[in-house]
């Protein structure tokens, strides 16, 4: 009999800082009429890092929701929604050096210019 190790949370138990697999669950209530979640298969979601917070936001202004992610020892990570497939976006030079110990992320139009701004906190 073989035992499979199940990982949960943001790290592999006993192996900090090795991150566990990240995944996105889709609520299938509209399609099924029942409370059921399905795992969304996407290679860019699997090895993000030790995710601690995320938010849905139209980062690129194309009228669909992208995913913005932060975590322990992670840079700000943007998963751009391209036809309901989330693609990890290459960050601009000013955002590439955002690696930190992030635990919170909020999106809001702080300067009143009509687009969302992001606040990351540790």
Predicted features by range, described:
Residues 1-122:
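Beta-propeller-forming repeat regions
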